[in-house]
Amino acid sequence: MTMIVGRHIIAELYGVSPELISREENVRCIVDGVVDEVGLNKVGSVYKQFNPHGVTGIVLISESHVSIHTWPEYELVNLDIFTCGDPQKAEKAFKLFIERFKPKSYRHYILDRG
């Protein structure tokens, strides 16, 4: 029997407003806000602003991590949400990211890790 220890959601969001995902401040505000709203336990974070635009960020949570990579020139966001413990928190975080980034379309994969 395989024991499931976490839920991992990998997502690609298409048609996201470049203004929303070009600058670190905007991306950080959205990601940190979702982590807080879902009730994940933030340990720390690192964000990198690319020139002329685009952001990579990772939030270390005691349950695992949330990472993001943005390509404003392609209106693209890649998300990685991995939580050990309550699998509903990963799903809630994903739904909030969809609400905040408002992609025209997306695809995602849900993996039960164990």
Question: PLM features: residue spans?
Answer:
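Polybasic/polar functional segments that serve as interface/processing modules
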Residues: M1-G114
